[in-house]
């Protein structure tokens, strides 16, 4: 039966880790005071008749703490790339210079920082909800084992405790990520 528990815990851990990875990806798209190439990950460029991720038509670099540069590989894509960056909703104003596009990051206003912190909180809450959903699935699986008399009540409680500990640890990691991200956002 311990093999079943190990399998269950491994599956739950994998699913909870997936929620954490999603949260990290969402956090990377939130703008902080510092330049980060991941900031432009959500940007899609109209290229060759389809929308392509920016990283498939250009190289993004960070030459300074408040500046991104986008080196477009195809000279004909510069205007489309500038438009995509400008229209991505991040409040950026790209400046083309040949095939190089400079993207200065303006200082965040206090209001914008608060909006970003709220967005980070929403992302974290979404991750917590996902983790709790995984926990619920695990608990239902344990109850199913108990109903089929594959495990006893005591063993079921032990398994449930281990699932709860896994859940608590993951939610603690989410909270730590949120605190760190909010600190980054609020840093002037």
From Swiss-Prot:
Its main localization is cytoplasm
Q: State a single Pfam family of this protein.
A: RRF
Coiled coil segments of this chain = none
**tRNA processing keyword on record:** no
An example GO CC term for this entry is: cytosol
- Could you tell me which Gene3D superfamilies the record lists for this protein? 3.30.1360.40, Ribosome-recycling factor
- What biological process terms from GO does the record include? cytoplasmic translational termination
Q: Does the keyword Cytoplasm apply?
A: yes
Transmembrane ranges, per UniProt, are none
**GO MF assignments:** ribosomal large subunit binding
Protein keywords: Cytoplasm, Protein biosynthesis
Compartments, as annotated in UniProt: Cytoplasm
InterPro entries the record matches? Ribosome_recyc_fac (IPR002661), Ribosome_recyc_fac_dom (IPR023584), RRF_sf (IPR036191)
Its job:
Responsible for the release of ribosomes from messenger RNA at the termination of protein biosynthesis. May increase the efficiency of translation by recycling ribosomes from one round of translation to another.
Q: Which family does it belong to?
A: Belongs to the RRF family.
Protein name, per record = Ribosome-recycling factor
Encoding gene, per UniProt annotation: frr
